[in-house]
């Protein structure tokens, strides 16, 4: 980046920081992983959270749910030092952080999924995630990638601003206050909860209510008349998908999973776990309060008593709950997401025409209570896949876990088909290290090779004829996880690893080498997640 552009980028980020009310870190800084007592929906419990101040400091006035915002600019080098200060043995005490949506080109060791690219970080230790973001911008997030730890609270938004954003003329305001996070929340800590539990509530920007619970404060998003806001919607869900809308307002969608798209106007968005959208809202309605709605597909649905809701408040409106009603007729369809730049899938425009074609048949084993892909559940290996590769293993046959590793050669077009056969769908599948082109979407029987949606999380659908199909090019060496982003499903096996161009994988820093010996020496008490007998 030339000096003038770097100065502009720095000023841009400073303005975002200045106008955003929320604490933020980045592109360098300490992220403290601590246990904090929280009550985001009126129910008090301990949680695992990410914040900008250590455990020894006073608890922030605002609970650390969601976690601290990380932000920077396109072209930045991110140096995020994760400091583990966890002490509550009822939840996991070790941790590992995934920076969702980043390619990690040349830094697969920093991708974060435990036992795929690293061993977890022990309590009392720290680990520096150091990675470059030369050519990505948009809306991302981060979360624990160790077992189901992020369901206990360790998740937060991550925004990379682009001073040369091609959509810049469409909005006036884009800062920390225009980030909208959606979370499912549980009153029982994950290690003690059911294998696939039902959420107790929905949190919007860390606040919500549960059915039959107290009238807890809801998140308020403030706007001024006639201004245009770029809202960044992030689903940090462990399970449900949400149907999102704002009463009386249309949503001009301009980004999906950090990919700029041809703008499209809708009035509702179905968003699955791990997905992100940016939309522009023009505050052109009467000065009033308007309901923001995020209706989950499971748990307590609807909006009675203010559940699954937040408030859009115009400057000058009374501080009251809205009385507005919902009327939506134009939902966002994935098949209408057209990339703004370089649309089109790689490879010949025929199904099965890629260099490598893989069918992933998902199923549920009622005997073992495991979800499988091609008959095999993903069981985390003792040694991370990356460590195995660096130690000399290079073929699918020699890598563990057996049956869950798929070796991919460099510079090949890969086509993955995922028929919707497994129970518990729709399954939102996320591929690490890449975006992909969705040449066949859920609910569609046609293939689109010319203008397919490009993203990093895709819903596999539930229809008997659904066969979601994606394509990508193997241009990024590393062991890349492909998994269901319903965290409870990942925990019982719904994942595979693509060992891509293994001979070109970059070596990790020396501190990475220390993670496994430290972790392997820990006692069960040090690892946490102890379930009372």
From Swiss-Prot:
* Functional summary from the UniProt entry: Lignin degradation and detoxification of lignin-derived products.
What sequence ranges are listed for the domain Plastocyanin-like?
A: 25-171, 173-336, 382-501
Keywords attached to this Swiss-Prot or TrEMBL record, sorted alphabetically, are: Copper, Disulfide bond, Glycoprotein, Lignin degradation, Metal-binding, Oxidoreductase, Repeat, Secreted, Signal
User: Is the keyword Glycoprotein assigned to this protein?
Assistant: yes
Q: Where is the signal peptide?
A: 1-23
Indicate what this protein is called per its UniProt record.
Laccase-2
Which cofactor is essential here?
Cu cation
Disulfide topology: 119-516, 151-238
Name the Gene3D superfamilies on file: Cupredoxins - blue copper proteins
Q: How is the cofactor bound?
A: Binds 4 Cu cations per monomer.
Catalytic activity as recorded in UniProt: 4 hydroquinone + O2 = 4 benzosemiquinone + 2 H2O
The EC number(s) attached to this protein equal 1.10.3.2
What Pfam family is a match for this entry? Cu-oxidase
- Residues the record lists as binding Cu cation 1: 98, 430
Gene Ontology molecular functions? copper ion binding; hydroquinone:oxygen oxidoreductase activity
Which residues are recorded as binding Cu cation 4? 427, 484, 489
Q: Which residues bind Cu cation 2?
A: 100, 143, 485
Q: What class of enzyme is it?
A: oxidoreductase
One GO cellular-component annotation of the UniProt record comes to: extracellular region
List residues binding Cu cation 3: 145, 432, 483
- Carbohydrate attachment residues: 467
GO BP terms in the entry: lignin catabolic process
Localization recorded for this chain is: Secreted
Would you identify the family this protein belongs to, as annotated? Belongs to the multicopper oxidase family.
Q: How is it modified after translation?
A: N-glycosylated at Asn-467; contains a high-mannose glycan with a varying number of mannose residues.
Q: Which domain of life is it from?
A: Eukaryota
